[in-house]
Amino acid sequence: MAASEADIINFRWKKISIVMQSALNALNPVLSVGEQIHDVLKIHKGLIGSEASNRAKELLSLVDIEHNRLDSFPHQLSGGMKQRIVIAIALAIMPPIIIMDEPTTALDVIVEREIISKVIELRKKLGFTILFITHDLNLLLEFADRLAIMKDGEIVELDEVKNIQKGGKHPYTNKLIGSIPSASGVRQKGLLTKPDKLTFPKDPILEVRDLKKMFQSPGLFNKDKLLAVDKVSFKVFKGEIVGLVGESGSGKSTIAKLVTRLIRPSAGSIYLNGKNKKVTESRNVPLEYRKTVQMVFQDPFGSLNSIHTVYHHLARPLFRHKLKNQTEMFPYIVHLLEKVGLTPGNKFAKKFPHEMSGGERQRVAIARALSLDPQIIVADEPTSMLDVSIRMDVLEIFAKLRKENNLTVLFITHDLASARYLADRIIVLKNGSIVEENASEKLIQNPKKEYTKQLVTAASPGWLSSLGENFEKKEEYNDQ
């Protein structure tokens, strides 16, 4: 574009605005919500004082946020509330086009649905156009009018959603559609299909009893404490895959860190193979525990060091635990990489993280966790940052490892549909406590608690159609 900076500033927000993926990074942490909205209004509308304040209140009302939040700072808001604030700022000058770049990726499924419902309601009310960018095809099939499928930097298919739902014309489109998990209907067949009957040893490999974790609230003089995990108890058996499901702030990732002993609990006990590890009393974690329980983190780029090769990442734990000598190291690492689908392994061993896709990086993270031949892997949201086809590939790796190695997996996710396809049993968490626990299919088909019912509904196709006439799609298009 041959435009001056002044022209671009005039164009930005007035003609087109954007809602970024990470609301936390999009908002200035040292400015209040009101100050950030006022900045846009002052620059583009010349509004100051009471005029700006009144307009800011109107914008908060549009996204269902109380006016007193104008004095709040980003760190005082939930993820869903921060994203609503970013949407309010994008609407400040009422541009005809709003670009939404992965606006719900970091949000749990219930908050995601609330945000999308509000966006569609505002579109109907205010008449703006949305360019919605996401890797979540299932989400777009619910509310988009038209859909452009991209692969390797090119659009491979562009059509109305109602036509794509009947079957795409491009093989890649059909691959994406076939990879979409659902929390409703009959469970799809495939590698992830679990046996009709699974038998596990009588004694659990992992048992958590009355686990509790409290965090000190930030601030030098703030003596308040946040109860993240409240008397949680559950058992996991050898060869079992257990899904730990809940919204943001439910305590599931805190439990992952407690089980892997990355943090110490405030109270409670963890038993491994029937042995009480007395985690509340010991600060030092035995090497044997680290070898037995490994973790796969949510962000495959953040969990890998950008300056080291894949070989270094897998070799380091082997050196630390003295499991392989120098001559055994490289062949073993190649074997691990090929075990998780990275072939040829000798080629991937020499790569750096930035030379791989998100799915490949997550496979490396899984291979690293497998390097010590652990009995338990704690997978903390391992697929939340991956697109739907890669997500299913990663789930298949865990299913394959369980089948071949009798590996035990504690699978932590906010995606109930993914948990259904992988886990034998699902534990639902809310506000640090267990709400419901049952075999996966029983919990999906017949949830007992209201919160579980909300999760199932939010993860099922057709959730948007139940919200009323405000959310109807357009039936006709004008190509002009």
Segments predicted by a language model, with ranges:
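A short, proline-enriched helix->beta-strand linker immediately N-terminal to the Walker B motif
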Residues: 92-96, 371-375
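ABC ATPase "signature
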Residues: 155-159, 167, 437-438
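ABC ATPase C-loop
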Residues: 85, 90-91, 364, 370
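A short, surface-exposed alpha-helical micro-motif characterized by mixed small hydrophobic
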Residues: 140-142, 419-421
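The feature captures the beta-strand-to-loop junction immediately N-terminal to the Walker
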Residues: 245-247
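Helix-to-loop junction immediately C-terminal to a conserved catalytic motif
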Residues: 260
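Conserved ABC ATPase "signature" region
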Residues: 51-68, 328-347
